[in-house]
Amino acid sequence: MPHSSDSSDSSFSRSPPPGKQDSSDDVRKVQRREKNRIAAQKSRQRQTQKADTLHLESEDLEKQNAALRKEIKQLTEEMKYFTSVLSSHEPLCSVLAPGAPSPPEVVYSTHAFHQPHVSSPRFQP
């Protein structure tokens, strides 16, 4: 059975002595911790960058939203104005009066198309 003892002797010779193995494990543990620390730091940086990007995007969307709300308000006011003008015009309009003759064909010069039908100091083209 000396042959089996040789194989066990060779297995002992391959593994480092107990003190040296602990030191090797410690080095690997320190390296793993350092690698993990760096990965965690990069992850936090990416997370912060993503949060900053989302914050800027949110601010831009808030500005767009405010501008669109302002435009809606202006268009609503313009619609109210033109509705009022139309309501004032309808009772006087000969085209809409019952039994009124058909309106004559009107030939406009190209210049007439650039003139507003209703002049409004608030809504000039």
From Swiss-Prot:
Keywords: Activator, Cytoplasm, Differentiation, DNA-binding, Nucleus, Phosphoprotein, Repressor, Transcription, Transcription regulation
Segments for region (Basic motif): 28-50
Gene Ontology CC terms: cytoplasm; nucleus
CDD domains: bZIP_BATF (cd14701)
Subcellular location: Nucleus; Cytoplasm
Top-level lineage group: Eukaryota
GO molecular function terms attached to this record: DNA-binding transcription factor activity; DNA-binding transcription factor activity, RNA polymerase II-specific; RNA polymerase II cis-regulatory region sequence-specific DNA binding; sequence-specific DNA binding
InterPro entries in the cross-refs: AP-1, bZIP, bZIP_sf
Domain bZIP residue range list: 26-89
Renumbered residue ranges of the record's region Leucine-zipper: 54-75
Modified residues (Phosphothreonine): 48
Residue numbers spanned by region Disordered: 1-58
GO biological process, one term: lymphoid progenitor cell differentiation
Pfam family, one: bZIP_1
Low complexity composition bias: residue spans: 1-14
Post-translational modification: Phosphorylated on serine and threonine residues and at least one tyrosine residue. Phosphorylation at Ser-43 inhibit DNA binding activity and transforms it as a negative regulator of AP-1 mediated transcription.
Modified residues (Phosphoserine): 43
Quaternary assembly: Heterodimer; mainly heterodimerizes with JUNB. The BATF-JUNB heterodimer interacts with IRF4 and IRF8. Interacts (via bZIP domain) with IRF4 and IRF8; the interaction is direct. Also forms heterodimers with JUN and JUND. Interacts with IFI35.
Family per similarity comment: Belongs to the bZIP family.
Annotated function: AP-1 family transcription factor that controls the differentiation of lineage-specific cells in the immune system: specifically mediates the differentiation of T-helper 17 cells (Th17), follicular T-helper cells (TfH), CD8(+) dendritic cells and class-switch recombination (CSR) in B-cells. Acts via the formation of a heterodimer with JUNB that recognizes and binds DNA sequence 5'-TGA[CG]TCA-3'.
Protein name per the record: Basic leucine zipper transcriptional factor ATF-like
Organism lineage: Eukaryota, Metazoa, Chordata, Craniata, Vertebrata
Name of the gene this protein is made from: BATF
